[in-house]
Regions:
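Active-site glycine- and acidic-residue-rich loops that bind
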Residues: 83-97
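Short acidic/histidine-rich active-site segments
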Residues: 106-128
Length: 167
């Protein structure tokens, strides 16, 4: 759901919600995780996921892309067993430190959201996938952990969420 760039009419919101619900049903049918884009719509998203969880149980799983909410909102997504993904924005604002400190490490993922929100020290340049390491470094710093420990945990999280098996 993205209520930021669209005209916020009830018709537009309703249509987005209907399509999201269809998408959730398809993901569950094929046992695939959801990658959730949610902007200016956390309450609506939480309500839909909670309702669909009642219908589908733990087969419904996924990740909240570019999580930019509060610790209170994070807890609600975590209770639904959705991981939270952090971007380069965490490297240039302290607004997310509380969330990063409190989210269980096994529920954290990282991303770049290329070409936007380039992390420090690359601000002003086009974002690239290679810069995700800066997001990992920031998480390690905020949590007072070793970067390798964070990398290892995030890799395990990705494998779990996407059901990737080691060969």
């Amino acid at each position: 759901l993205d209520f930021f760039r669209t005209e916020e009419t009830e018709g537009n919101k309703k249509r987005q919600k209907e399509i999201l619900e269809q998408h959730i049903d398809i993901a569950v049918e094929f046992n695939k995780p959801l990658m959730i884009h949610c902007r200016n719509a956390y309450d609506d998203m939480l309500a839909i996921i909670a309702q669909k969880k009642k219908e589908h149980g733990d087969v419904l799983r996924g990740n909240i892309h570019f999580f930019a909410g509060t610790w209170n909102t994070a807890q609600k997504f975590l209770a639904l067993n959705f991981t939270l993904s952090f971007t380069g924005v965490i490297t240039f604002t302290r607004d997310y430190d509380e969330v990063i400190k409190n989210v269980p490490l096994e529920m954290i993922m990282t991303e770049t959201d290329c070409p936007y929100v380039t992390p420090v020290p690359y601000r002003g340049k086009r974002n690239e996938p290679a810069y995700v390491v800066e997001v990992v470094k920031k998480i390690a710093k905020v949590r007072n952990k070793d970067v390798e420990e964070i990398k290892t945990a995030i890799l395990a999280n990705v494998k779990r969420v996407f059901n990737i098996q080691d060969k």
